[in-house]
Each structure stands twice: as C-alpha cells, then as structure tokens.
Amino acid sequence: NMWATPDPIFSQAMCRVYNDYAWEVFGPYYDRLSPLACVATGDIDSAIAEIERCAKLGFRGLSLPCKPMWGPGTSEDANYNNPDFDRLWACIQDVNLPMTFHVSTGKDPRGAKGNGGAVINYVIHSLAPTAEPLVHLCSSGILDRFPGLRFASIEAGIGWIPWMLRAMDEAYEHHHFWVFPKLNMLPSEYFRLHGAASFQEDPPGVDLMEKYGLEGNFMWANDYPHHEGSWPHSEQAIERTMGGLSDPQREKILGANAARFFGFDVDKLLAYRSAATAQA
C-alpha cells in the first residue's frame, strides 16, 4: 500500500515509481486498458505535480487515498473538505481526469484483533471508510466550486450508497441550522451527477439500484486477480447478481458506465474485440 505511511513525501515517491511502472507496462495498450495514476494527497504541492505529470503521460484516471494522511485521524487533521485542498481540486478539474477512492486506503485496515477480527477489519476498517471522501465531496461545497470533478468508490460495493445518499440529505435538511455552506442542490444530487461506485457481487445493492434509479452510477468489476473477486467465474457471478436486469441496464453496468467514466472509445474497444476474436 503506497499510502501506508504518515510521510506524504515518501508516499508520493512510491506512487511515482508505481506510476512509471504502470505506464511502461500498460501505456502501449491505452485504447483498451486504463491504469490509474496513484497520488499521495498529504502534500498538496507534490500531489499537483504528480497529477500534471501523469496527465501528460496519458493516464485516464487517478487513484487517491480515502484520507489525505495515513492514520486514525482527528478533527485537527487535514481532510478533503478543508479549503486548502481547493488547489488540488482545481488541478484535477483542469486535467479532466476522474478520481477514484479504493478500499483499505487512508487508514490501517487491520484495526481489530481477536475474535471476529478478519470480518470486523474487512467491513469496518476496509469497506466503511470509503464513504468518507464521497461525503466530503458531496456535502462541503467542493462540487459547486469545481463542477467538472468526477469520482468513484472502488471495490466497496453499492448496497450502502442509497443509504448514504439518504443520510446526507437528511442531515442537510433536518440539521439545517448547523449546516454550512448552503449548497446549490441536495448532497445526493451531486453523487448522481458526478459519482460512481464499483461492485463485484452485491444483490441487495442491485435491488436498491433499481428502486432508486442509480443504473447510471454503478459499474461492475471482477477484481481480478484477488480471491474475493469473481474471476474465473465472472459469467456465473453476473447471472447470479444481474440475471433479472434488462439488457439496457446490464449494458450500462457491465461496460457503458465505465467507458463513459474513464473516457474510452467504445467503437475502438469493439473493433479490438472483433479483431481478437477473428485471430482466435
């Protein structure tokens, strides 16, 4: 984990080495693969420099940690709702790259020990913190100031997203005496316009997706090659989870949303697939 250090300069150095490797290996296949440029955000100046460098190389997206500084965190620590980060958001908007937040970043996901530790760590210390940067973006006025930003939660599932959207709106409306700044729309609307989330197998999430009309915000992934992913049985996993969806819904979730989010040319992808099939 390149972000597993309280030293943001060291973290950025690791990110830079990884980014060089990722572009060297996958850059030649730019039209069909999208390595994400990893960026440490604890030091804003070095983060901006790395984002600009990777954008010039040709990366299609960014991977940021769920919290700028590694560790348990306090209210005094730098966090994404702090106006100091406006320079970072301005840079990301200028290079026009989507940003993603992956599970198990920003804090140690091994916070629990003893009975049930593996489950507790996975649910509480790995998956749950992924909501934090999304709430920061949707509720603090960032997206009013930088309406070109796009963001996604990666590998944390989708069943919790409708709950999060409702919770943000409830706090904004019912606690309005204490809420600042006042936003141009409800927090949930920012997610619908700017946000996305990926999942592997999440039947409750798919059910809620249909109820709340979030087909345009969710992206399926197989998490290759991790053991919690669906590969090499992805076809069966898709049918288990999405067998009841319509073809237009499946088209969005299984590819169209991701192509739009990361800026792929679908015609080029289809042409490559046709050529590969013909050679097989």
Language model: regions and residue ranges:
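Active-site gating/metal-coordination segments in enzymes
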Residues: N1-P133, S140
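Mid-to-C-terminal alpha-helical segments outside catalytic/metal-binding sites
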Residues: D20-P28, A49-R53, L57, S140-G141, ...
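Short, surface-exposed connector motifs at secondary-structure boundaries
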Residues: Y30-P35, R60, Y122, P147, ...
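Hydrophobic faces of well-ordered beta-strands that scaffold small-molecule active sites
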Residues: S34-A37, L62-L64, M99-F101, F151-S153, ...
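Aromatic-lined glycan-binding groove of carbohydrate-active enzymes
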Residues: M99, V103-K107, C138-R192
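Short, well-ordered secondary-structure micro-motifs
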Residues: G111-A112, W163-L165, L208-M209
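Short secondary-structure boundary/capping segments
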Residues: G117, A167-E170, S234-Q236
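Aromatic-anchored helix/helix-loop segment that forms the rim or "lid"
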Residues: H125-P133, H176-D207
